[in-house]
Amino acid sequence: TYTSPALTQDTWFRRLSSATIGLITCTEITDTVKVTVINFDPGSVSGAQTICENGTPSAFTSSQNALGDGLITYQWQASLDGTSFTNITGATLKVYAHGAMTTDTWFRRQATSTLNGFQCIDYSGAILVTVNNMTPGSISGTQTICEDTTPAAFTSVPATGDGIITYQ
């Protein structure tokens, strides 16, 4: 058997066999076999962004489409930890628009190149959509007062969330 090193282009192989008896060597060459290399680049995506809770992110775009020798297909995937990705049902175009979000989520695009029934699969880099979660808190102190009278102080429960919180 023979194990070839990694290939980057189509390569043909054949074997030379020799048999020697005494001073006589006979040599024969086998038929050739071809290893077809599917040249493939999964491309890249862009669209990392920060949105407000329940907001809809801008569509993720294809910075570079996948390139390959075969038929190229796409499948978008999502992950809450940036490591374990799952397919997004129906998300099979080179661009993707996600609905409203409440949780930070990583997205990546799987590209598949199919040639002669063989598939090569690779992934774009992952992009993160950061969700700025915030609870507005509350105020109370509804009252009725006379004209030119100062109302009693309002009471409040502070807002909580990601980032710096300010009030107006």
How should these model regions be labeled?
Residues S18-C26, T112-C120:
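Short, solvent-exposed loop/turn segments at the edges of extracellular beta-sandwich modules
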